[in-house]
Amino acid sequence: MKALLDLFKQVQQEEVFDAIKIGLASPDKIRSWSFGEVKKPETINYRTFKPERDGLFCAKIFGPIKDYECLCGKYKRLKHRGVICEKCGVEVTLAKVRRERMGHIELASPVAHIWFLKSLPSRLGMVLDMTLRDIERVLYFEAYVVIEPGMTPLKARQIMTEEDYYNKVEEYGDEFRAEMGAEGVRELLRAINIDEQVETLRTELKNTGSEAKIKKYAKRLKVLEAFQRSGIKPEWMILEVLPVLPPELRPLVPLDGGRFATSDLNDLYRRVINRNNRLKRLLELKAPEIIVRNEKRMLQEAVDSLLDNGRRGKAMTGANKRPLKSLADMIKGKGGRFRQNLLGKRVDYSGRSVIVVGPTLKLHQCGLPKLMALELFKPFIFNKLEVMGVATTIKAAKKEVENQTAVVWDILEEVIREHPVMLNRAPTLHRLGIQAFEPVLIEGKAIQLHPLVCAAFNADFDGDQMAVHVPLSLEAQMEARTLMLASNNVLFPANGDPSIVPSQDIVLGLYYATREAVNGKGEGLSFTGVSEVIRAYENKEVELASRVNVRITEMVHNEDTSEGAPPFVPKISLYATTVGRAILSEILPHGLPFSVLNKPLKKKEISRLINTAFRKCGLRATVVFADQLMQSGFRLATRAGISICVDDMLVPPQKETIVGDAAKKVKEYDRQYMSGLVTAQERYNNVVDIWSATSEAVGKAMMEQLSTEPVTDRDGKETRQESFNSIYMMADSGARGSAVQIRQLAGMRGLMAKPDGSIIETPITANFREGLNVLQYFISTHGARKGLADTALKTANSGYLTRRLVDVTQDLVVVEDDCGTSNGVAMKALVEGGEVVEALRDRILGRVAVADVVNPETQETVYESGTLLDETAVEEIERLGIDEVRVRTPLTCETRYGLCAACYGRDLGRGSLVNVGEAVGVIAAQSIGEPGTQLTMRTFHIGGAASRAAVASSVEAKSNGIVRFTATMRYVTNAKGEQIVISRSGEAMITDDFGRERERHKVPYGATLLQLDGVTIKAGTQLATWDPLTRPIITEYGGTVKFENVEEGVTVAKQIDDVTGLSTLVVIDVKRRGSQASKSVRPQVKLLDANGDEVKIPGTEHAVQIGFQVGALITVKDGQQVQVGEVLARIPTEAQKTRDITGGLPRVAELFEARSPKDAGILAEVTGTTSFGKDTKGKQRLVITDLEGNQHEFLIAKEKQVLVHDAQVVNKGEMIVDGPADPHDILRLQGIEALSRYIVDEVQDVYRLQGVKINDKHIEVIVRQMLRRVQITDNGDTRFIPGEQVERSDMLDENDRMIAEDKRPASYDNVLLGITKASLSTDSFISAASFQETTRVLTEAAIMGKRDDLRGLKENVIVGRLIPAGTGLAFHKARKAKESSDRERFDQIAAEEAFDFGTPSAPAEEPQQHPAAE
């Protein structure tokens, strides 16, 4: 019977396609889609519920309501398939054709498509070269447009009001034609000759010089060329026929109580049909023009609402006063077609439940409740029951399963064996959020999860839920097992660290077991082996922490690598260790020495241990080891019985004295402030500093007391050992809590921040053990509340950032092994403030060297170019003291659509070179986005305690060596003989004997140098000191002070401190100055020599002038004698706000969005010499004269700080005016490498502040995508337009073609796009439309007649194909190869056949002409 039924099934052919094209539909095309015209607004008959004929649900047009049954019931059953009933006109076929058959409405008057009218920039306006307002006035019948001026002086496309029109008609009669409404616009569009227009525009573009015109012409040219290329006629933007959506896609559902629920589209269509029919009738009746015109306008508005309600005028509303949901609303936004249905589908064979911990599971297992498994694996069970003959039909099998008979449970066990399931925890922030496990059947209703995978899922057991998905096909099961099994994903793709690191109780247990105690029971005993130790421990002869000597057998790598030799050989050594460590040595994998365990295991150590195991012993051994570590950790933690009590929080006895001293200091500052020696701001800064330091000191005293305890050793001597205090052990091991939190429990809570980030100067001197008083508690609530509010707000921001990142990188896949480029970037250790923030080894690990790595001492090549630098290589490089290595980077990869494996380097989640097909773009986006949400959630952990680093006020050397100053360092010697720095960008370096840089420190303007160039110093020597709370203005010349424009009440204000009564002069902000004249002047100082002449800058005719910035406190008086290096004014630095990640997320977003910062610093456009020109009103003029003698001027606001002085040589791209850097300038002036370094370092700074590790290459991948487009500067012979932005790969392809044809290629500039803009300007319109601004993207694509080659992942998910990554990439490659080989074979056969029949091989279309026939 089944075979019989299959006979009648319609053959459904799966379409294989490689691209999707979008365009405008011509009226004929729309009619060809349609199955009939919808003439009536009726939907269904309210009594019979049958659709009305010719109405919106008409069965004749759209197909039958029931399968194989016509409406009147004359033809039923399959045998009449394809018959059209003569009575009701319905074709007998499947009812589901009502989902695909369209209808149409013939409009009585043409109507403009609102997308092409109102979606900015207006496409109609561009094609017609008219303004949007004018076109709108014509379309909505408020004005006439001239179509054919004839012999009159009128111009085509001229707009006239009705009055004008009647006057002109009286004047010229019917010599000209003007129209209103869409008919007029359609006529104009028809009249356009595109080819002619394109030619004229191209010539105009070449001849015009005005920027505005070039821009305008280029835009119009682009649109017209698009029409020309795609073969779309402009008049199709005006609709004559309106397609009607199939009825099943806009259903009408009867509710109980005789009411109906309907899709808004039906309402919108009804309005269109009603107005259209009324208009038809009015036209037949030859109604007065004004009535017809009104009806046409109403029709236009009805169609507008149907296509995009609310885009123009007020949105049409339904009965409930809500705007109706139009066709455009159906596809855009989070709930639209793209994001709701195409990118996010719900799937079958899935379930969800609460998770509980499963400590007995192996890493690759999960506990699945029996009832869930029964439901999830139903089809498999049915199949087995039939095969085994327990049930004969599916129905019988169903009954068996429902009754849950014994045989069903046996079958379930069998079905589940070796059939992995996938577990997912929302939010899935990176690829480890979904992993595959082998299910183990358990009782109860909760899923059991292995404790070690919790870190990857970010799961805890406080009520989290997880979803289970069953991979059905064999391929899916295979992929789940090989690629997604939890035991195959032990490294984080973000940084290559192990993800299966124990936490909390496991760490505590291992730490407790590996600690050592002085004079423990059985100390000093010797044992012949581990089994003896265990026996002694079980008989309570020794304690876990006792120091003992044990003979331990290690399995080490065999030196003998000949065939048949075992990989590991035993090695026996005697170790001084502790009982706990000896017991743990049992689980050590082969190939690891005991020394890795012979120390207290803290969380970091355990992570390092697992990492070492992975690198040395491979994946399998590591997974087994991690599992055993976990088992031991839990067991030992239970044995340890660590708990907390109030007495564990030891408050240091010195606390009172420390706090008392601080209070005295604060009082002293108050006194100084009262007597006017310091400003309010300085006092505040100092008070905050004192309390910060006090908080630190109390914390330190507390930690000292907590971390050690007095003991008596074996010889009866008093000594101190590391404490066994429970709280200390928890924090020290990294199990829970931190020093900061303990400080709040037992030290002092310290300073708190207000919600705006400023610090409250009264600290909380109490701690939680002593308890807070009401005021202290109240101050604390600020931080806690802010934390919660931040969390709520920022989770959304972080998710949005991830979404943008994924969107910009989703089409970046590794597609080949090596692109063969010789470009790369130079990597150095990252040094900040003299500290190595990131060592060179960490930056180059897993990269491919692009140049030979050479030993600096012997000049021999250590690693050839093209080597993948692994752990051994980077250790060797570090040992040799090489401080710079050039490596490949995704930025310079020359693969056209994607990346090559060599430029990407190691796949961090697998630990080997990346495979072809890896979706590295998405991995990069996830790696950057995932911690984003953690950053957001990490604000309130410290409970808002203001952790403010006391500001740096000096630099000291970290290593021995020789002091070297950079070329930019300049200093003068003052009257006291001190060296005062007067350069803005000077740096001091410490070099070793080989001249290799060991550290580098920025020395700020105004610092006092304590060591000079070339001095040999020891580590710890101070190099320079400065006042951290003010920025000085220093004179480089001596003389008598002469003020200019320093007028009280005009440019400066006398600030009399209301407390102290002392006065200082402060430069007033420009915005607050009264008169216009005073806004343009700048208070400054000139110096006079002994004769009263102005002091000149040596070698020039310019007088020395030193300007005061806004906010400067002037410390000298007019007529005062000053010496070289003396301070003229001080600028107080702002009170620092606490650094919270609040700055973090937005900072990352603004870097990736490539926003220009406000008040950006100015970079030198050229290399040359600086000089100052004549100042204008509010600006100073800086001139750079380049090497050819050309002058480049910069106008700089007076309050800005210029970093260069007269006659200084600057290099192109050097910062000349202080301020945050603009990434666009960096790209333009310093190039791609500098830009990438800037973005990578800035993003890393934010994450490093939070202690988050992300590999640089992820950020580089994103920067590559931001540089995806180029701007054409000279189009050569290509099809591009100058100034146009095009995809880099398109441009390279086009240039290759030009070179092949011996034509001129185009030249271009790099352009940096923000991630949102880059996503929207991608080649794939499907991907862009599903991201943001759907309407705009689709409008543009339709006009261009764009073709989407389905290169990215997103497009393929949307059209439902396998994604071109991983196994999907291989599938598509194989498919394409087969297609091309089939084509070749086909051509070959065709050629052979033609040859066999003896037909002439000439093409048949053109008959061969004999010369004689002419």
UniProtKB/Swiss-Prot annotation:
Is DNA repair one of the keywords UniProt gives this record? no
UniProt: Zn(2+) 1 binding residues: C70, C72, C85, C88
Which InterPro entries is this protein grouped with? DNA-dir_RpoC_beta_prime (IPR045867), DNA-dir_RpoC_beta_prime_bact (IPR012754), RNA_pol_asu (IPR000722), RNA_pol_N (IPR006592), RNA_pol_Rpb1_1 (IPR007080), RNA_pol_Rpb1_3 (IPR007066), RNA_pol_Rpb1_3_sf (IPR042102), RNA_pol_Rpb1_4 (IPR007083)
Q: Summarize where Zn(2+) 2 binds, as residue positions.
A: C819, C893, C900, C903
- Report residues binding Mg(2+): D460, D462, D464
Looking up Pfam families in the UniProt record yields: RNA_pol_Rpb1_1, RNA_pol_Rpb1_2, RNA_pol_Rpb1_3, RNA_pol_Rpb1_4, RNA_pol_Rpb1_5
User: EC number(s) for this protein?
Assistant: 2.7.7.6
Keywords in alphabetical order, please.
DNA-directed RNA polymerase, Magnesium, Metal-binding, Nucleotidyltransferase, Transcription, Transferase, Zinc
SUPFAM superfamilies recorded: beta and beta-prime subunits of DNA dependent RNA-polymerase (SSF64484)
Q: Which reaction does it catalyse?
A: RNA(n) + a ribonucleoside 5'-triphosphate = RNA(n+1) + diphosphate
Its needed co-factors are: Mg(2+); Zn(2+)
Tell me the cofactor note. Answer: Binds 1 Mg(2+) ion per subunit. Binds 2 Zn(2+) ions per subunit.
Q: Name the Gene Ontology molecular function terms of this record.
A: DNA binding; DNA-directed RNA polymerase activity; magnesium ion binding; zinc ion binding
Give one GO biological process term.
DNA-templated transcription
GO cellular component assignments: DNA-directed RNA polymerase complex
Stretches the record annotates as Disordered: 1391-1414
SMART domains in alphabetical order = RPOLA_N
- Compositional bias (Low complexity) spans? 1400-1414
Q: What does this protein do?
A: DNA-dependent RNA polymerase catalyzes the transcription of DNA into RNA using the four ribonucleoside triphosphates as substrates.
Oligomeric state and interaction partners are given as:
The RNAP catalytic core consists of 2 alpha, 1 beta, 1 beta' and 1 omega subunit. When a sigma factor is associated with the core the holoenzyme is formed, which can initiate transcription.
Its family?
Belongs to the RNA polymerase beta' chain family.
How is this protein named in the record? Answer: DNA-directed RNA polymerase subunit beta'
